[in-house]
């Protein structure tokens, strides 16, 4: 049973947009079977599916079986330093999913 949502960032610079397909390629290049996250939230707020939610994620050792992994694009400022670059859409989606206890 999945009872936890884990939110990750893509650790990419502010303003650089990437897709779930891009992240899938990065993960495959690192030896994953496919993208490790269940959902990706792009800069414009578009939510793209990643790994099917019926499958365990590959995003947080020890928590993959019981969690949904969400990755938002960003996490670094334009100079490459860590920064909270979450968009309003990202905050709203993750907050609603957690509050409602819905299946994301």
Regions inferred by a protein language model and the residue ranges of each:
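Single conserved hydrophobic/aromatic residue that forms the stacking wall/gate
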Residues: 93-104
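Generic short alpha-helical hydrophobic face used as a protein-protein interaction/packing hotspot
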Residues: 11, 43, 74, 98-99
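Conserved residues at the C-terminal ends of beta-strands
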Residues: 8, 73, 104
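Long, well-ordered alpha-helical scaffolding segments within enzyme catalytic domains
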Residues: 16-34, 66-95
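Glycine-rich phosphate/pyrophosphate-binding beta-alpha loops
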Residues: 58
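Short, conserved "active-site rim" segments that organize catalytic pockets and cofactor/ligand binding
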Residues: 1-55, 64
